[in-house]
Amino acid sequence: MKSRAAVAFAPGKPLEIVEIDVAPPKKGEVLIKVTHTGVCHTDAFTLSGDDPEGVFPVVLGHEGAGVVVEVGEGVTSVKPGDHVIPLYTAECGECEFCRSGKTNLCVAVRETQGKGLMPDGTTRFSYNGQPLYHYMGCSTFSEYTVVAEVSLAKINPEANHEHVCLLGCGVTTGIGAVHNTAKVQPGDSVAVFGLGAIGLAVVQGARQAKAGRIIAIDTNPKKFDLARRFGATDCINPNDYDKPIKDVLLDINKWGIDHTFECIGNVNVMRAALESAHRGWGQSVIIGVAVAGQEISTRPFQLVTGRVWKGSAFGGVKGRSQLPGMVEDAMKGDIDLEPFVTHTMSLDEINDAFDLMHEGKSIRTVIRY
């Protein structure tokens, strides 16, 4: 079938809006009509050429919502007409990782997904007879996309796709990191480095967890009003100080902050976040994705004296079994999604959405098909 899509033909180049061909779903696959998709920093990271798994030409996009059109052989968990969110972190329920109960990382389709292919090692997209790669198992920058059944969360059909599409990545990543990875407790102190969608979601998650002090940190003070709306008690611009941000935080509590979250992908900030964590028990959660090849470092003394470095992917959330509940929470108002959507655009305007993001003028732009 034909589908309008925003295709990245080469790294560092604007996306091109073209009509592509989408093949029917094969065994274990599902064809969906995407209704809305967010434009995320991860898409920009891959488009820049810095992503070691980046392959071109590719249909990007991984933060979407849509409706099932057709299912392939053997698919039982969804049917045509069901409303779904594609998942870049699958949940097969059968691999060693899923069975462990210790992680949300599933390896069922990871190897082929990292190569831009469907589980059988081929692609369902083509343009002028030439194959196009998939992206993170989702490719939501196409009006129609094919996704593995294990990479789809079935959601309430009454949910507002313009908002809940954000649960496909950024908001779930931030809120989940608070509850699942850090396990923030009432009264704990929290510092959030970087106030993009993920960082703001961490702030909201910290408020849900009844954290005592929630410190929001960013060099763009225009983000502070929204941070306060989500629950920040303090907002700090590091540029306002003539000393390292670590020292600013240690002035707040000389022993450090209970939980720090790095939501940028900057290895220097990762170190600062760790060294701002509370002596004896503080933990720092790395959420931001650094450029390939970069390494993190600190003095071993920082760890010997009780600080812990952790990482978090998709907030530790199991997509198929847990994400539908988060959609319900959003519908009840327990998760506030509307403020994240600062702009809505058509697919034809998608390059403008990337520009807004790079200029720091948007939190999330949602593309409506």
Curated annotation (Swiss-Prot):
Keywords: Cytoplasm, Metal-binding, NAD, Oxidoreductase, Zinc. Homodimer. GO terms for cellular component: cytoplasm; cytosol. Induction: Induced by formaldehyde and repressed by FrmR. Binds 2 Zn(2+) ions per subunit. Has high formaldehyde dehydrogenase activity in the presence of glutathione and catalyzes the oxidation of normal alcohols in a reaction that is not GSH-dependent. In addition, hemithiolacetals other than those formed from GSH, including omega-thiol fatty acids, also are substrates. Also acts as a S-nitroso-glutathione reductase by catalyzing the NADH-dependent reduction of S-nitrosoglutathione. Its EC number is 1.1.1.284, 1.1.1.1, 1.1.1.-. Belongs to the zinc-containing alcohol dehydrogenase family. Class-III subfamily. Coiled coil: none annotated. It is found in: Cytoplasm. Pfam families: ADH_N, ADH_zinc_N. SMART domains: PKS_ER. The gene is frmA. Signal peptide: none annotated. SUPFAM superfamilies: GroES-like, NAD(P)-binding Rossmann-fold domains. Zn(2+) 2 binds at C92, C95, C98, C106. This is S-(hydroxymethyl)glutathione dehydrogenase. InterPro entries: ADH-like_C, ADH-like_N, ADH_3, ADH_Zn_CS, GroES-like_sf, NAD(P)-bd_dom_sf, PKS_ER.
